[in-house]
């Protein structure tokens, strides 16, 4: 057996990989093991499995998403622990890039073999490897760097299911809630609803008792042993939680015992706003536990006092460290308790009311989960900040990270490519030069001043570091060209830049006269449209800098007319004037993005507008008017006739909104897009290709129309893509918002949905070499092409993705659920061929 296969078996015995992991499949290759270990997460867990607490998993990045910076940090953490804890010599270790770039995977296997023979590893009783003679064929490792370059990791697997118990504190919570069960009367089996109500009441009572015990048995005795700063750091806002839950417990008890639970739904709705103080608690609980650990190690008197307090509180069963995690568990249970109650409520009015309470508690749970997730992001950002030299600005101001990695850059007036490492955020790109394990900042690019454009001509060179795209300055200053190592990496970078730019300039940011911009809200805030909370700790949503309206990204298009159309009116929020090269920009330099209206009837000035309004604006049917001022209740609006340039007032019923013209999309970087092409040329392209090879072409005789050409049963078939009302479709029963969505959907679903005789999916893009498509299919295996569907859900709300891992939803979307493992309230699923993560509280699962 080859060494890499023996290594995989050893990792399974160490409980790092599950027994059915893809490295055990008959089709498995050394590539699969390399890809699995490449981000360093499993290696860190391996050391913890061999000796507990070798590495603090809170200090590594459990979801590095193949960020080069975060993966290398994980790998270096593993290598350091191999020396310091396992006594290995540096000469026995691989280098970080040997694994990340798989430039010497043989050395990685050798290091793991030596690790398996260390005294600590042998003490576990697990046999080291290799256990048998094997031919060490170095040739199998030679092609790995190229293979890694060709294959981007999709976020498709529950890779860390067996690794890390994110549900920290869950067992403690369950133990505490069950402690009183023996003393409670049993619920009748035929009345599950009564059981649900009893559980809500009893667990609230027990939880309040737990909070009170923290206050009585830990806070009061420890006050004289800790400094004020230490005390606040450990106990955060527990006194506020105690007061809150005493009141909540009383109201729940009163509703269930005295009012036949008729107002229970209202209790939870009323308390949603008050329960958001859990955001503060959940933000601080991790550092509270770290502070407690540090104080216990450095102050012997505190350590002894903690043990004494624990014995008095619960006979030593639970430590303060255990109990600090319980509040985070409780606040995430309310929606689950209400969900059960709704399920077993039959009265239509009661059910509808309880659903309102359920929505409120789901919103609260998602808010808390996003606070937790943002705390992970802030830890990443802090690591970036500490590793980049000469960086004097707080990285936090640049928004959330979208990706990082190596790239080559030229300015558009020079042609020398410079090797750089870039960190891409929502609002900026930090361009760095790598210096050992750290980075030297060379430039910060403000993305608010740029737009992105593909350079399709570079794709024809077909060699490494030749795949380019442009970053173009919107005010005509010198731009940049970025070069990527492979075509796939270029596609990924383009998507990440486009996502960042869509966060800066989202659709509908200026609709209804608004001026919405990404914003960090210092107080808990709700969306003006859906009334749900803006979630997280920074850049939670969008603020109109004219009227102060607040909204989610997905809700921007549904905000009512701006209350301050004229930016000079009282109460308007103003942005500081932007300057370019020290000169104030004139209005002509900026596209104000004002709404455009189409004139539907002539207007020559009769009837005239009111005298105090101003002069009439003459219009001809078909003219386009730029709307300057007006609201839904005004008889006359002010605008500029783009044909004459004149400004004046006109009847509001003389115009209608201009039809939305979608921006032209550049598909040239897609491996399936052929550009303008006729049927005969398409048939020539496909004639010598395998069946299910396809292309999408622009039909030259029909402007704006597309067609799919696919080889099926050794013949080229052609399918016209119909466009109507802004949607694309080949079958009337399934429509898509973009050509990209349509192609993605039919990659996974047979074309027979629209054409009975055409039973195939879109499998092989015609630009992709046949061998690479085949290899990728073989490596992926059937299970990745067809993930196991755990259930079906319906989207209850719109959701707009903030990065490439997330899945945008529209209300009513049917979602296939693939994963529910995330403890942060996110599930993984598919909508119309698009796969990604979405908030579980935004969907309702079919029973």
Curated annotation (Swiss-Prot):
Region feature Sufficient for interaction with ROS1, mapped onto this chain: 560-847
The Calponin-homology (CH) domain, residue ranges: 1-119
Domain SH2, first and last residues per copy: 672-766
Zinc finger Phorbol-ester/DAG-type: from-to: 513-562
Tissues and organs where the protein is expressed, per its UniProt entry: Isoform 1 and isoform 3 are widely expressed; both are expressed at very low levels in skeletal muscle. In keratinocytes, isoform 1 is less abundant than isoform 3. Isoform 3 is detected at very low levels, if any, in adrenal gland, bone marrow, spleen, fetal brain and spinal cord; in these tissues, isoform 1 is readily detectable.
Post-translational modification Phosphotyrosine, affected residues: 141
A matching Pfam family: C1_1
Domain SH3: 592-660, 788-847
Biological process according to GO: angiogenesis; B cell receptor signaling pathway; cell migration; DNA damage response; Fc-epsilon receptor signaling pathway; Fc-gamma receptor signaling pathway involved in phagocytosis; immune response-regulating cell surface receptor signaling pathway; integrin-mediated signaling pathway
GO cellular component term, pick one: immunological synapse
Disulphide bridges: none
Post-translational modification note: Phosphorylated. Phosphorylation can be mediated by ROS1. In osteoclasts, undergoes tyrosine phosphorylation in response to CSF1.
Keywords, ordered alphabetically: Angiogenesis, Guanine-nucleotide releasing factor, Metal-binding, Phosphoprotein, Repeat, SH2 domain, SH3 domain, Zinc, Zinc-finger
Stretches assigned to the DH domain: 192-371
Factors inducing expression: Down-regulated by EGF and TGF-beta.
Domain of life: Eukaryota
InterPro entries: CAMSAP-like_CH_dom, CH_dom, CH_dom_sf, DBL_dom_sf, DH_dom, GDS_CDC24_CS, PE/DAG-bd, PH-like_dom_sf
MF GO annotations: epidermal growth factor receptor binding; GTPase activator activity; guanyl-nucleotide exchange factor activity; zinc ion binding
Limits of the PH domain: 400-502
Reported function: Exchange factor for GTP-binding proteins RhoA, RhoG and, to a lesser extent, Rac1. Binds physically to the nucleotide-free states of those GTPases. Plays an important role in angiogenesis. Its recruitment by phosphorylated EPHA2 is critical for EFNA1-induced RAC1 GTPase activation and vascular endothelial cell migration and assembly. May be important for integrin-mediated signaling, at least in some cell types.
Known partners and oligomeric status: Interacts with the PH domain of SH2B2. Interacts (via SH2 domains) with the phosphorylated form of EPHA2. Interacts with ROS1; constitutive interaction that mediates VAV3 phosphorylation.
Protein's UniProt name: Guanine nucleotide exchange factor VAV3
């Amino acid at each position: 057996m080859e060494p890499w296969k023996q290594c995989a078996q050893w990792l399974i015995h160490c409980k790092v990989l599950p027994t059915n992991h893809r490295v055990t499949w008959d089709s498995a290759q050394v590539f699969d093991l390399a890809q699995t270990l490449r981000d360093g997460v499993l290696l860190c867990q391996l050391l913890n499995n061999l000796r507990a607490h070798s590495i603090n998993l809170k200090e590594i990045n459990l979801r590095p998403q193949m960020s080069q910076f975060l993966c290398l940090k994980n790998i270096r953490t593993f290598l350091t622990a191999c020396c310091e804890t396992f006594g290995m010599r540096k000469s026995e270790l691989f280098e970080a890039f040997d694994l990340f770039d798989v430039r010497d995977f043989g050395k990685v296997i050798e290091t793991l073999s030596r690790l398996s023979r260390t005294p600590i590893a042998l003490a576990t009783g697990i046999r080291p490897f290799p256990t048998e003679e094997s031919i060490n064929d170095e040739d199998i490792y030679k092609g790995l760097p190229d293979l890694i370059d060709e294959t981007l990791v999709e976020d498709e697997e529950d890779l860390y299911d067996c690794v890390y118990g994110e549900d920290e504190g869950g067992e403690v919570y369950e133990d505490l809630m069950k402690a009183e069960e023996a003393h409670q009367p049993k619920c009748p089996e035929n009345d599950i609803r009564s059981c649900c109500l009893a559980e809500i009441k009893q667990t609230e009572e027990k939880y309040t008792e737990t909070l009170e015990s923290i206050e009585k048995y830990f806070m009061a005795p420890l006050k004289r042993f800790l400094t004020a700063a230490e005390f606040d750091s450990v106990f955060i806002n527990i006194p506020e939680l105690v007061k809150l839950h005493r009141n909540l417990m009383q109201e729940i008890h009163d509703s269930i015992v005295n009012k036949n639970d008729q107002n229970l739904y209202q209790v939870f709705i009323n308390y949603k706003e008050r329960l958001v103080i859990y955001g503060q608690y959940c933000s601080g609980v991790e550092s509270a536990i770290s502070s407690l650990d540090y104080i216990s190690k450095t102050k012997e008197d505190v350590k002894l006092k903690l043990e004494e307090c624990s014995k008095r509180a619960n006979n030593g069963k639970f430590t303060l460290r255990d109990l600090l995690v319980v509040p985070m568990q409780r606040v995430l249970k309310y929606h689950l308790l209400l969900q059960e109650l709704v399920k077993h409520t039959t009265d239509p009015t009661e059910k509808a009311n309880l659903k309102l309470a359920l929505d409120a508690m789901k919103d609260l749970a998602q808010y808390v989960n996003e606070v937790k997730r943002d705390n992970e992001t802030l830890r990443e950002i802090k690591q970036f900040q500490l590793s980049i030299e000469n960086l004097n600005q707080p990285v936090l101001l640049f928004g959330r990270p979208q990706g990082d990695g190596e790239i080559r850059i030229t300015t558009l007036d020079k042609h020398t490519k410079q090797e750089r490492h870039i960190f891409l955020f929502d609002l900026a790109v930090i361009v760095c030069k790598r210096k050992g394990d750290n980075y030297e900042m060379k430039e910060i690019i403000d993305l608010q001043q740029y737009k992105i454009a593909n350079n399709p001509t570079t794709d024809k060179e077909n060699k490494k570091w030749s795949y380019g795209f442009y970053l173009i300055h919107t005010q005509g200053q010198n731009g940049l060209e970025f070069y990527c190592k492979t075509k796939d990496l270029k596609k990924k970078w383009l998507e990440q830049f486009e996502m960042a730019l869509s966060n800066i300039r989202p659709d509908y940011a200026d609709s209804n006269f608004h001026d919405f911009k990404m914003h960090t809200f210092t107080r808990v805030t709700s969306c003006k449209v859906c009334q749900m909370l803006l979630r997280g700790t920074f850049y939670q949503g969008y603020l109109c800098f004219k009227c102060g309206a607040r909204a989610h990204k997905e809700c921007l298009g549904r905000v009512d007319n701006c209350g301050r159309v004229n930016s000079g009116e009282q109460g308007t929020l103003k942005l500081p004037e932007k300057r370019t090269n020290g000169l104030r920009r004139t209005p002509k330099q900026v596209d104000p993005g004002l709404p455009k209206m189409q004139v539907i009837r002539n207007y020559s000035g009769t009837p005239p507008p009111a005298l105090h309004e101003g002069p009439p604006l003459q219009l001809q049917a078909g003219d386009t008017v730029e709307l300057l001022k007006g609201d839904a209740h005004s008889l006359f609006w002010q605008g500029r006739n783009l044909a004459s340039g004149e400004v004046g007032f006109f009847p509001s019923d003389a115009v209608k909104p201009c039809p939305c013209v979608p921006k032209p999309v550049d598909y040239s970087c897609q491996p399936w897009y052929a550009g303008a092409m006729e049927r005969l040329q398409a048939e020539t392209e496909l004639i010598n290709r395998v069946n299910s090879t396809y292309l999408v072409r622009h039909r030259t005789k029909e402007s704006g129309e597309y067609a799919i050409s696919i080889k099926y049963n050794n013949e080229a078939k052609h399918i016209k893509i119909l466009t109507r009302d802004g949607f694309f479709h080949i079958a009337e029963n399934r429509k898509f918002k973009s050509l990209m969505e349509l192609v993605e959907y039919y990659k996974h679903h047979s074309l027979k949905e629209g054409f009975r005789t055409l039973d195939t999916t879109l499998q092989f893009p015609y630009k992709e070499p046949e061998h690479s498509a085949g290899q990728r299919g073989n490596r992926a295996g059937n299970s990745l092409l067809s993930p196991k569907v755990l259930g079906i859900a319906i989207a209850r709300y719109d959701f707009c993705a903030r990065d490439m891992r997330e899945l945008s939803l529209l209300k009513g979307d049917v979602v296939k659920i693939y994963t529910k493992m995330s403890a942060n309230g996110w599930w993984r699923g598919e909508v119309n061929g698009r796969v990604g993560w979405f908030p579980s509280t935004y969907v309702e699962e079919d029973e």
